[in-house]
Amino acid sequence: MNIFRFLGDISHLSAIIILLLKIWKSRSCAGISGKSQLLFAIVFTTRYLDLFTNFISFYNTSMKVVYVASSYATVWMIYSKFKATYDGNHDTFRVEFLIVPTAILSFLVNHDFTPLEILWTFSIYLESVAILPQLFMVSKTGEAETITSHYLFALGIYRTLYLFNWIWRYQFEEFFDLIAIVAGLVQTVLYCDFFYLYITKVLKGKKLSLPA
Amino acid sequence: KRGNCHKDEL
């Protein structure tokens, strides 16, 4: 464990908590893409199948349980509990264009042609594009609530910190995983536009508005 | 080939 990975995990966890609290407290999922949350639930499910078979540490297991539980809770709130506030008309990204290519790619490019490894690879590829429906929705509605932009910032920063974690691990642990690194780079690049707006607008107290 | 060491990341 290194500081970048730890801060990355904390950032990821806080993004998940921010979103849960936003929906639960405001009893509304307005402006939130249910499709992205569905994709995240798939990402965690396919990545943590070894949750019960491969014990790494208490920290690792507990974080995985929290991620999986909270992602399902978020999906449940959006599509069930508060579905009346779900803005389906603006959440129109075709997720099959994300799931099918990443699934095919995980069969073609992976470290090991075994079910667990292919599912892990699929989850890595899917996670790198899972935020697209949410970013698409923000661009369609033309703006996002401030709390939603904090959620997106924390979520984007987590994988950016993981990039530093991989530099660190390459340097000091001779550890190197090209699949995770390339997907992490793609994921971070997708946030660049949002990072720019967040830093130039939200941090100055303005509302986040994308050029529609 | 990456060993199982990798699976220590979330």
From Swiss-Prot, chain A:
Which Gene Ontology terms of cellular component type are present? Answer: cis-Golgi network; COPI-coated vesicle membrane; endoplasmic reticulum; endoplasmic reticulum membrane; endoplasmic reticulum-Golgi intermediate compartment membrane; Golgi membrane
Q: Which domain of life is it from?
A: Eukaryota
Region span, Interaction with the K-D-E-L motif on target proteins: 47-48, 159-169
Q: Which residue positions does UniProt flag as site: Interaction with the K-D-E-L motif on target proteins? A: R5, E117
Q: How does it sit in the membrane?
A: Multi-pass membrane protein
Intracellular or extracellular location(s):
Golgi apparatus membrane; Cytoplasmic vesicle, COPI-coated vesicle membrane; Endoplasmic reticulum membrane; Endoplasmic reticulum-Golgi intermediate compartment membrane
Membrane-traversing stretches: 5-24, 33-52, 59-79, 93-110, 117-135, 150-168, 179-199
Chief localisation class: Golgi
Instruction: Enumerate the UniProt keywords alphabetically.
Output: Cytoplasmic vesicle, Endoplasmic reticulum, ER-Golgi transport, Golgi apparatus, Membrane, Protein transport, Receptor, Transmembrane, Transmembrane helix, Transport
Family matches, as PROSITE patterns: ER_LUMEN_RECEPTOR_1 (PS00951), ER_LUMEN_RECEPTOR_2 (PS00952)
| Important for recycling of cargo proteins with the sequence motif K-D-E-L from the Golgi to the endoplasmic reticulum, as annotated region | 204-207
Positions on the Lumenal side per record topology: 1-4, 53-58, 111-116, 169-178
Positions of the record's site feature: Important for recycling of cargo proteins with the sequence motif K-D-E-L from the Golgi to the endoplasmic reticulum: D193
- Family (UniProt): Belongs to the ERD2 family.
Protein role: Receptor for the C-terminal sequence motif K-D-E-L that is present on endoplasmic reticulum resident proteins and that mediates their recycling from the Golgi back to the endoplasmic reticulum.
Q: Under what name is this protein listed?
A: ER lumen protein-retaining receptor 1-B
**Organism this protein belongs to:** Xenopus laevis
Coding gene? Answer: kdelr1-b
